């Protein structure tokens, strides 16, 4: 099916990060896969990951994760649809506006504390570096450097040791909004799952969100008082299923503000 003509009976969706949200508890993956199978007529399944397209497919095969209906890869720089995973070229045309990867790479070539990651972690719209905060400029300093050279981009710091530079129009959250519009699914009927700081923009907005319990969950602690963000007690895939119950996601009330305020006193674990 063309991406803009999703079946009308699929009126809600679940989008999850891979590494910090689904992977980490292999025993929970069959239960999550069975949940998707039981609800495939009503729930669109999506992945939103920082991994490249090829790397994401490889790790999903390795861990037996069902092939998603939508795959957002490269931190929101590429979108593929359906089981054949055809690419959304309109999205790549959209994010290409004012993007100049060669100029950014030349500008940062001699910057201390930055080292290009291997080619397999790069794509046309994602420039990825290893980051040494002891030697490199802070993230705000890198953004200022780009602006002084009339370059616009999103600069994302993950785990304090990686820097990704992507187009100003690209991010996981912006890609999710684009997909929601294409599929005709209200953001209030979308559950997004994340587990690290790289997922923060994905979790802000009108979608329902869950921070699964893992060792990087504290990076999202600023969201603890944000409505529609639930901090699960269970880790990884079980945390996503916990959020499905918390939000009554499959019931008629999914997305009802009265039902989606996080529990009082809930905090990251």
Label for each model-derived stretch:
Residues 7-27, 203:
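Asp-based phosphoryl-transfer active-site loop
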Residues 21-25, 48-50, 168-169:
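Short, flexible loop segments at the rims of nucleotide/cofactor-binding pockets, characterized by
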Residues 42, 68, 113, 150-152, ...:
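A generic structural signal for alpha->beta connector loops
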Residues 102-205:
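Conserved acidic, metal-coordinating active-site core of Asp-based
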């Amino acid at each position: 099916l063309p991406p803009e003509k999703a079946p009308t009976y699929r009126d809600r969706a679940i989008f999850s990060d891979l590494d910090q949200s689904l992977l980490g508890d292999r025993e929970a993956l069959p239960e999550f896969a069975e949940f998707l199978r039981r609800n495939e007529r009503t729930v669109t399944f999506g992945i939103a990951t920082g991994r490249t397209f090829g790397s994401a497919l490889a790790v999903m095969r390795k861990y037996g994760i069902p092939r998603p209906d939508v795959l957002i890869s490269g931190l929101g720089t590429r979108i593929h649809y359906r089981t054949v995973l055809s690419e959304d070229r309109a999205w790549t045309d959209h994010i290409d506006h004012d993007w100049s990867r060669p100029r950014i790479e030349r500008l940062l070539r001699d910057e201390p504390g930055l080292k290009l990651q291997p080619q397999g972690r790069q794509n046309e719209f994602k420039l990825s570096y290893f980051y040494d905060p002891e030697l490199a400029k802070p993230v705000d300093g890198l953004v200022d450097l780009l602006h002084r050279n009339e370059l616009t981009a999103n600069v994302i710091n993950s785990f304090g040791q990686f820097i990704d530079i992507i187009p100003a129009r690209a991010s996981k959250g912006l890609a999710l909004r684009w997909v929601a519009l294409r599929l005709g699914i209200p953001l209030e009927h979308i559950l997004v799952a994340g587990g690290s700081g790289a997922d923060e923009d994905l979790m802000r907005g009108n979608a329902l969100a869950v921070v699964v319990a893992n060792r990087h969950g504290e990076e999202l602690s600023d969201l603890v008082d944000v409505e529609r963000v639930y901090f699960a007690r269970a880790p990884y895939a079980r945390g996503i299923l916990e959020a499905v119950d918390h939000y009554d996601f499959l019931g008629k009330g999914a997305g009802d503000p009265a039902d989606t305020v996080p529990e009082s006193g809930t905090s990251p674990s």
